[in-house]
């Protein structure tokens, strides 16, 4: 192998390392913890679930894709990121799944308040009559 070939291989290796670091840096993830678990009662009032097994559970959200990793919401498929978040607009992702009934659908929604001061950003997760709240960090 001549010096020119070695140099080309070196440059290609260096480029691939730098590119992979750039990709990983852009793959930001939220780490979230559930602090409150509630549901909407039949009379429209909000009821906090006492001793909920969800409280204290953690999950992660891949910011670019909306994919959720963790037991709290692991069954959610095909997320759609509606807003990637900024100082003036929360990060928003939805999941839409067809229900068994005609023209029915299940819609789940996650909002993370990126504009909140400090490192912990409040979130709200809504699924039908279920509401979970907590905090996320990047």
Regions found by a protein language model. Name each.
Residues 1-11:
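Bacterial N-terminal signal peptides that target proteins for export
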Residues 119-129:
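Short, exposed beta-strand-loop hairpins at the edges of beta-sheets
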Residues 33-68, 104-108:
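Short, solvent-exposed loop/hinge segments that bridge or flank secondary-structure elements
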Residues 137-138:
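Short, solvent-exposed mixed-charge patches
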Residues 64-107:
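Contiguous, well-ordered beta-strand patches that form the walls/edges
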